[in-house]
């Protein structure tokens, strides 16, 4: 004769088998390709970090080991009125043989009604079970999002680690529960917390080849250069696991490809030793694209200076062509100045030094007019060539040396015109070269003035762009928070409709 079995008791273990349920089917020791031994180096890669913390997330429960309140929290068999009576006693935070409270059991099994009653009675939130896990960690580990949200809303700390160093965020990332991970971050979860293997949530996602979570954490500004206990970056872990898609994703973030682990190996070294040809090609292409930037950063300053000096005449020539219309529309004083220079050259064909002194003196005196043209002290009509005070200088040979020193000191005081030099042998140069230097001097000052105005405008534009970007970031953050709240409300409505 077959013994009768209570249908209620028989259904419970079948409904939620320990360690496995419909949505928890991925909790097994072969959840990663590297655990299944695909690839030459993958098995060793996963053995670097213990996977036991993530296996069998649900509690093993025997009915005879639980008290009345713990049974009600786990199975939810007790009517609400009786449960309220139980919660009036002093044993609301009582633990069973494995240090589990009623809150642990209710969260692990998704009994949100019991969790709500326990929270209303102000039960302790930060009690640890035998594996130093809080009720929040159990709720996240078992993917009971509604219970986890209630705990967070009542002030549960999301950064308390278990005996493996994993926080609630580590388990959300392992479960690929993007909504739960986003909720934890909104409630202050540390995105850079490390477990005992030195894995941050991002490194854990890379190690598990969870590309969706890797993208999410990169978007949340996770540190791409974080190191595990072996000094390995996210890129090295992705290479060791043979995930070309994650390697490509990380390379798009301009990650350091030359970082070495404690064994002195780089990502490329592991790719070569594991014969991952696709990854080798990705790394090679990335380094080739980065090479121009590195070579320009390590170039010789003397060579750069030489190239600049060689390119200066071409730059000035191009500037002269591009600004031809502007130069032709200058005020009449510029035309007078050019006419005066030509006439002076004809009158004083034998005195090079005097003309050079007048030109430089006039250029130095032009600071008040933006540095474009020399200033004149007196002008009676257009055909007047130079002021009387300047013409008299040509009849005073004993003052030439003093005037030369004055001109040199004025030239050296112009900080932005270092490219224009006046040699001491200028007295022996011909008038054509001197006149060419004068035109170059005038064009360069005009170019510098225009560059200064462009820089001011550019600065204003950049400030406006930065302000808009900051405003956009604030709007995106607010939108994400509203999205999470809407999804949570939809989940709660769905639960209430059942």
Curated annotation (Swiss-Prot):
Name used for this protein in its record: POTE ankyrin domain family member A
Organism: Homo sapiens (Human)
UniProt repeat feature ANK, residue ranges: 98-127, 131-160, 164-193, 197-226, 230-259
Signal peptide bounds: none
Coiled-coil segments: 469-497
Family from the record: Belongs to the POTE family.
Keywords: ANK repeat, Coiled coil, Repeat
Superkingdom field: Eukaryota
Statement: the UniProt record of this protein carries the keyword Coiled coil: yes
Polar residues bias spans: 290-302, 348-359
């Amino acid at each position: 004769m077959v013994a009768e079995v209570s249908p209620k008791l028989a259904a419970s273990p079948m409904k939620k088998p320990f360690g496995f349920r419909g949505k928890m089917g991925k909790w097994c020791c072969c959840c990663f390709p590297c655990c299944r031994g695909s690839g030459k180096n993958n098995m060793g890669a996963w053995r670097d970090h213990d996977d036991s913390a993530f296996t069998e997330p649900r509690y093993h429960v025997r009915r005879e080991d639980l008290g009345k309140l713990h049974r009600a929290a786990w199975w939810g068999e007790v009517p609400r009125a009786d449960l309220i009576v139980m919660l009036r006693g002093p044993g609301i935070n009582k633990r069973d043989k494995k240090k589990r409270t009623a809150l642990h059991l209710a969260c692990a099994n998704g009994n949100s009604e019991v969790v709500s009653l326990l929270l209303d009675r102000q039960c302790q939130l930060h009690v640890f079970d035998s594996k130093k896990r809080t009720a929040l960690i159990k709720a996240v580990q078992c993917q009971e999002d509604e219970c986890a949200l209630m705990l967070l809303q009542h002030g549960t700390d999301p950064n308390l680690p278990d005996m493996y160093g994993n926080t609630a965020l580590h388990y959300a990332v392992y479960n690929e529960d993007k909504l739960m991970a986003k909720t934890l971050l909104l409630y202050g979860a540390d995105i850079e917390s490390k477990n005992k293997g030195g894995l941050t949530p991002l490194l854990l996602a890379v190690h598990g080849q969870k590309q969706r979570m890797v993208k999410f954490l990169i978007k949340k500004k996770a540190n791409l250069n974080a190191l595990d206990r072996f000094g390995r970056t996210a890129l090295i872990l992705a290479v060791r696991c043979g995930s070309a898609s994650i390697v490509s994703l990380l390379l798009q973030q301009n990650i350091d490809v030359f970082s070495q682990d404690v064994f002195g190996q780089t990502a490329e070294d592991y790719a070569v030793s594991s014969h991952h040809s696709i990854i080798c090609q990705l790394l090679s292409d990335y380094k080739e694209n980065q090479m121009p930037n590195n070579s320009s950063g390590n170039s010789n300053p003397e060579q750069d200076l030489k190239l600049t000096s060689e390119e200066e005449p071409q730059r000035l020539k191009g500037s002269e062509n591009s600004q031809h219309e502007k130069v032709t529309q200058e005020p009449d004083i510029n035309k007078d100045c050019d006419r005066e220079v030509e006439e002076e050259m004809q009158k004083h064909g034998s005195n090079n030094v005097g003309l050079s002194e007048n030109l430089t003196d006039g250029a130095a005196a032009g600071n008040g007019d933006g540095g474009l043209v020399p200033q004149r002290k007196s002008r009676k009509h257009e055909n007047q060539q130079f002021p009387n005070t300047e013409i008299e200088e040509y009849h005073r040979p004993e003052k030439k040396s003093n005037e030369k020193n004055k001109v040199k000191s004025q030239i050296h005081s112009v900080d932005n015109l270092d490219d224009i030099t006046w040699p001491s042998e200028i007295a022996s140069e011909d008038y054509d070269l001197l006149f060419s230097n004068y035109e170059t001097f005038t064009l360069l000052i005009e170019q510098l003035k225009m560059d200064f105005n462009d820089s001011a405008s550019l600065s204003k534009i950049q400030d406006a762009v930065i302000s808009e970007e900051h405003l956009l970031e604030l709007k995106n953050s607010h939108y994400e928070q509203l999205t999470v709240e809407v999804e949570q409300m939809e989940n709660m409505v769905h639960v209430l409709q059942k």
